[in-house]
């Protein structure tokens, strides 16, 4: 297999590696969500074909957008869909009432609604509602132009209520009532899986997992915690303990990922400590699987403390011990509710520009397919709304996913129309043929955000070409051609407009986000290095925040790499520097974890002064990123009352900080190996 890959083009090899990673991704709840979506799709086809309900592709799209990873999230989205359906139909009837016989007025009214919806989609937390209203309003206004009878138009519009609401009811029955997937159960499964990984690292030597995966797992646990808080009363009552449990498991999973078990395999003094640590992890795992809080009386003896310090496990032991001794009824910190609207919604011109660009793209597509009298390519207008994203990089990503999904769906529809459809006689045979297509699309759609839209688009394109408004076999290949051409035209129009009209590049945002991540890391460095529970909980919370910030920066970096309107050399230089900052930020974090091990037993006032110097240097570097004026920090340590081991660990932190890229040089230069500055003893 590897020999065959050597002869393939590099982009194709990268694409294959990407799809292999996406298709093999495991996360709690993915298999149940896939099965729920698969069964829901088959039921929708059966119901729509039996009762001759039009717009089958739209009903399938409701399922793919609505069925989420857990019952609470699905219920929340279902409520949004009901609200969106009411707003959609209401806006359509207003358009018809005021401007049915006046195409220009009708287009202007629909354009105003689209403009407002796209603005709210960008500025409001519930952007999904306005996204749905935008699509229906701009497409629904074209019904009077296609049909000469107002009664038929009204009837089709009323059918849209059924088309949108009965899949919503179906997904509530399947996901919320009949086969509920609770967030708390998924959280317990995820925590136990992460503890399994951490415990195995204590005895088995293996290649460390990529840091990006570690950060994604940490973020997944934080998202699940939000759902547990909203859905589970017991979790909410003891939210402080469970939040500490989540951050503790994240810390163990991340730090033990780099633990080298082979380096201490022959050290007999460390073996009892590892066994004790494994038994404590197993006890915590058992309590979590039973949905209970965990209590432990473990106290590290002098021998265990010395062994833990020798192998770099002291901090892990102390943090695990603090969790075992934490009061489950500790009151949680007061939660802050985020605002519904973006703080700069009415001051930032990018929001209204975003809406205007989308409106212009839709109008160009509408005028084009109306002018050439090619109604079949109406998907070009819908594509302009679907691929509209706040920045160029994410828009290009969405365009690629939409094209890929449409291509796969069109190919499957073509093959089915030519080779399968002539042999079908009844609905059972049709469902048997559709089952594998829906299963594959459901598995893709339940993956990560990097590829999930391919599954949704594949099913919608396939349904538009083979199942839409026809309650029997279809042999018209023109439908497949029209849908594919419409999507391609919409992508081309959107790409041109978003690139040359008010392009929203993240090239300026990326250094600011990097500065924010390093600022959060500097805040972590200032946390008192003590064995007190409050200090350790603060440290763990900030540590998760650093993971999230660095992961966000890496995602922005990937999007900036797609912004071809930038100068190639400048773009590559920015991406390389940013990747270097992200990598060194991670290394500084882990180096500081090691320094925390030995620091807790020393005088805190002295350590705080030393930690402040590291934090000051890092914050100074972060402050210059926006202006590209950052140079590797210079740190001077004068204090002498410090242990040799801690001094060596702080030297490693200094070395990692010195390897941060120099943004004042015209090109990225290899990082210097020596620490810049002086460290005086």
What do these predicted ranges mean?
Residues 126-130, 176-189, 448-452, 478, ...:
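Juxtamembrane/interface segments at transmembrane-helix termini
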Residues 398-402:
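Hydrophobic alpha-helical transmembrane segments corresponding to the first two to three helices
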């Amino acid at each position: 297999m590897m020999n065959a890959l050597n002869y393939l083009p590099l982009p194709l090899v990268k694409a294959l590696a990407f799809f292999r990673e996406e298709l093999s991704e495991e996360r709690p709840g993915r298999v149940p969500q896939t099965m729920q979506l698969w069964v829901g799709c088959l039921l929708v086809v059966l119901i729509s074909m039996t009762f001759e309900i039009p717009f089958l592709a739209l009903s399938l799209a409701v399922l793919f957008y609505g069925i989420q990873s857990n019952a609470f999230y699905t219920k929340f989205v279902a409520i949004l869909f009901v609200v969106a359906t009411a707003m959609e139909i209401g806006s359509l009837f207003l358009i018809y009432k005021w401007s049915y016989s006046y195409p220009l007025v009708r287009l202007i009214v629909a354009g105003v609604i689209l403009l407002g919806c796209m603005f709210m989609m960008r500025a409001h937390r519930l952007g999904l509602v306005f996204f749905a209203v935008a699509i229906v309003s701009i497409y629904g206004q074209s019904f009077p132009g296609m049909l000469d009878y107002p009664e038929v138009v009204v009837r089709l519009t009323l059918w849209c209520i059924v088309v949108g609401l009965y899949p919503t009811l179906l997904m509530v029955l399947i996901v919320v009532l009949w086969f509920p997937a609770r967030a708390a159960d998924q959280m317990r499964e995820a925590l136990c899986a992460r503890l399994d990984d951490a415990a195995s690292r204590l005895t088995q030597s293996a290649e460390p997992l990529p840091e990006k995966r570690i950060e994604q797992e940490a973020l997944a646990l934080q998202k699940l915690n939000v759902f547990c808080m909203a859905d589970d009363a017991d979790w909410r009552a003891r939210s402080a303990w469970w939040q500490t449990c989540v951050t503790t498991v994240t810390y163990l999973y991340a730090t033990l990922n780099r633990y080298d078990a082979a380096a201490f395999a022959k050290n007999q003094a460390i073996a009892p400590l590892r066994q004790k640590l494994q038994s404590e992890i197993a006890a915590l795992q058992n309590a979590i699987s039973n949905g209970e809080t965990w209590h432990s009386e473990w106290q590290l003896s002098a021998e265990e403390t010395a062994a833990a310090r020798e192998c770099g496990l002291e901090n892990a032991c102390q943090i695990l011990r603090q969790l075992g001794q934490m009061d489950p009824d500790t009151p949680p910190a007061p939660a802050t509710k985020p605002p519904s609207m973006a703080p700069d919604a009415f001051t930032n011109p990018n929001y209204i520009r975003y809406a205007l660009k989308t409106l212009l793209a839709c109008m160009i597509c509408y005028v084009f397919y109306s002018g050439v009298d090619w109604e079949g390519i109406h998907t070009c207008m819908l594509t302009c709304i679907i691929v509209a994203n706040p920045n160029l990089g994410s828009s290009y990503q969405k365009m690629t996913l939409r094209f890929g999904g449409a291509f796969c769906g069109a190919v499957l529809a073509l093959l089915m129309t030519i080779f399968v459809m002539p042999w079908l006689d009844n609905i059972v045979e049709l469902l048997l043929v559709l089952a594998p297509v829906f299963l594959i699309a459901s598995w893709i759609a339940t993956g990560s955000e990097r590829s999930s839209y391919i599954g949704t688009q594949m099913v919608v394109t396939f349904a538009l070409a083979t199942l839409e408004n026809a309650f029997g076999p279809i042999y018209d290949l023109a439908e497949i051609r029209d849908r594919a051409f419409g999507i391609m035209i919409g992508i081309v129009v959107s790409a041109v407009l978003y690139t040359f009209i008010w392009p929203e590049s993240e090239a300026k945002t990326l250094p600011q986000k990097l500065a924010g991540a390093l600022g959060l890391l500097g805040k972590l460095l200032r946390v008192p290095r003590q064995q007190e529970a409050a200090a350790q909980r603060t440290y763990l919370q900030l540590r998760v925040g650093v993971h999230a910030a660095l992961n966000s920066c890496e995602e922005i970096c990937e999007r900036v790499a797609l912004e071809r309107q930038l100068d190639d050399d400048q773009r590559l230089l920015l991406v390389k520097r940013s990747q270097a900052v992200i990598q060194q930020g991670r290394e500084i974090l882990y180096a500081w974890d090691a320094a925390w091990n030995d620091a807790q037993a020393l005088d805190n006032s002295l350590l705080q002064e030393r930690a402040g110097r590291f934090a000051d240097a890092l914050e100074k570097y972060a402050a210059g990123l926006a202006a590209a004026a950052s140079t590797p920090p210079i740190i001077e340590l004068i204090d002498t009352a410090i242990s040799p081991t801690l001094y060596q660990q702080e030297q490693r932190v200094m070395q990692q900080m010195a390897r941060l890229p120099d943004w004042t040089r015209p090109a990225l230069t290899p990082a210097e190996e020596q620490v810049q500055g002086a460290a005086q003893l």
